[in-house]
């Protein structure tokens, strides 16, 4: 019986004495282990690509390859998280600028006419009020005992308006709240202008925001990303306004399609971004990772297509 604590070492750099135990476990490949199912599932995320038969590794697969796969996934998550951060900041800036200009109001977030009326979610049956949701977030942060520094400065310096200006309020929103705020805008013109900045139709943009929130949470919780089949699939981009990819890459439930979304959005934020070279460097650092599981397609000859030759990535 192997102590369950060895599983935790896959969440950090492996230390010498646990290394032997993990090798022994992998060689035995027994599920008679005193560990909960979530722990086994987490490990299995890195095992499955190397198994054609359940509980049996393919010939030639060693512990180093499994560990490399984990490290590759960790570095991929860090890269993705960094990209999402840059895009998220740009979305905040664009929404603040566009809406303040369209309504000639630095406090547009306090105008209920900017948002759709309360409605019932067709899936959950829950009542949704975008305006009131935003106001609750603002009130919670403005009345907190230890608010953000910029909120404290506003509260100590100004008495009216009660709420800070929009560019401060937007900094209080999580990615998910930002996504819901965009969907809750009443005027198509407002949504269109924000989406146009990123070269997208509003419907596609809102769908991508939803997926980006989902992936951000995956990264934040250190979950396996590289070969994940997405529960929240992004819309397929059928009418790109900028360079995109051939239809073979439209495997939108896999990670490479999401990486392509990040690249497309980053071009609007910084045309000279280095995502192509960073991703290529990561692939070269871990040459044994089966990247076909990320959603990179093969040609008729069965050979993986060269993603770097696609207009989006070149």
Language-model-detected regions and their locations in the chain:
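Long, contiguous internal "core" modules enriched in hydrophobic/ aromatic residues
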Residues: 6-14, 19-314
């Amino acid at each position: 019986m192997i102590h369950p604590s060895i599983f935790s070492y896959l969440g950090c750099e492996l230390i010498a004495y646990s290394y032997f135990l993990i090798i022994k476990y992998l060689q035995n490949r027994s599920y008679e282990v005193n560990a909960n199912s979530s722990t086994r599932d987490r490990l299995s995320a890195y095992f499955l690509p190397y198994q054609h038969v359940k509980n049996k590794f393919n010939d030639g697969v060693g512990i180093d390859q499994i560990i490399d796969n984990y490290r590759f996934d960790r570095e991929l998550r860090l890269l993705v998280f960094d990209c999402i951060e840059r895009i998220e900041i740009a979305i905040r800036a664009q929404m603040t600028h566009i809406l303040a200009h369209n309504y000639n109001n630095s406090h547009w977030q306090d105008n209920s006419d900017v948002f759709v009326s309360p409605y019932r979610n067709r899936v959950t049956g829950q009542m949704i009020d975008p305006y009131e949701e935003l106001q609750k977030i603002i009130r919670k942060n403005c009345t907190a005992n230890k608010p953000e520094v910029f909120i404290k400065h506003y509260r100590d310096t100004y008495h009216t308006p009660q709420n800070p200006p929009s560019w401060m309020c937007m900094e209080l929103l999580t990615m998910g709240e930002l996504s819901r705020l965009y969907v809750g805008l009443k005027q198509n013109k407002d949504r269109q202008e924000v989406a146009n900045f990123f070269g997208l139709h509003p419907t596609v943009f809102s769908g991508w925001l939803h997926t980006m929130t989902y992936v951000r949470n995956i990264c934040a919780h250190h979950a396996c990303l590289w070969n994940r089949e997405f529960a929240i699939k992004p819309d397929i981009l059928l009418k790109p306004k900028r360079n995109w990819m051939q239809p073979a890459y439209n495997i939108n439930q896999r990670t490479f399609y999401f990486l392509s979304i990040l690249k497309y959005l980053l071009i609007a934020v910084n045309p000279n971004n280095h995502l192509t070279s960073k991703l290529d460097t990561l692939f070269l650092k871990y040459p044994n990772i089966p990247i076909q599981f990320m959603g990179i397609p093969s040609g008729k000859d069965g050979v993986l297509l060269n993603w770097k030759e696609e207009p989006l990535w070149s």
